[in-house]
Amino acid sequence: MCIKHTLLLSVLVSLVACNQNHHNASSSQWLLIDNFESNLNDWQKADTDNQTKPHQPNPQITIIEKEQSSDHANHYLLKKPAAEGVIGNRKALTYKKLPKPVPVGETYTFYTRINVAAFPNNHAFGLSNLQPDEINKHGYDAFEPTLRVTDKAESNGHINDGALMVKTDTGYSNIQNYKTAQSAQPLNTNTWYNVWYVVNNASVKMQGQQYNVYVQGGEFKTQTLVYKNAKFRMKRELPLIYFLANCNTGPLKKPYGNGGLKYDDLYMSRGINLSSPL
């Protein structure tokens, strides 16, 4: 009897340990892209459409700042197209090579935290499958999976409201609150949002070149699917190799505004991984 109890206990302990290891495996699979706790030496910056007048070389602001909390000092990246009052920087590119490429045919999950420092603004971030010289050449068309934050007016007169946006085959779309069957609310300023985007880098023929987005923050109190089957911008069907962020003051005659966007805790994980890397 005692032996049976001992064997049963051993089995139960093994099962618990197995479950714990499985639970912890998801967080251990995350690869750090950057958490901005050191420097920006591995990042490249390029202002490839600098129309500032009077001309200002390298007008973009891409800096690490410190955020004081009750228990520790956290650092994050602040990105702006230029200082307040400076207009005409149309492409403020900032990018970093991923710790490993996302091969064609594979799915990876990317995680980041974002925080709108201020509106009005015009920001986009996501992934590229181009090398640096080609990123600089193509600008916005260097993106594949893309997320966008802006409240600018479009050329057709439509005014964006500051909700997080994704790329579609016809332009951009606000993320959705599927529970209310409505567009998501505008992002709150000075509020951190957790964003997961699950990137399917299979070919178009294999129903790839698309991504799903999950958000926690603001109106979404828990992690929530907010967009299904958003589309890669160019669908080049190449390995994804860079994290890319871009922002834009707007044209000299009708500037958008230079409000900043904060980034922190960029991670990637093979497969679908909706755990938190933090």
Question: What annotation goes with each model-predicted range?
Answer:
Residues 191-204, 213:
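Short tryptophan-centered beta-strand motifs in secreted/extracellular beta-sheet-rich domains
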Residues 75-167:
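Secretory/extracellular carbohydrate-interaction modules
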Residues 15-17:
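C-terminal motif of bacterial Sec signal peptides marking the signal peptidase cleavage site
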Residues 168-194:
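Short, aromatic/His-centered strand-loop micro-motif at the edge of beta-sheets
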Residues 24-54, 277-278:
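Extracellular carbohydrate-recognition regions
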Residues 224-264:
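Flexible glycan-contacting loops in extracellular carbohydrate-active proteins
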Residues 36, 264-271:
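Extracellular beta-strand elements of beta-rich domains used
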Residues 40-84:
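Extracellular glycan-recognition surfaces and repeat-rich motifs
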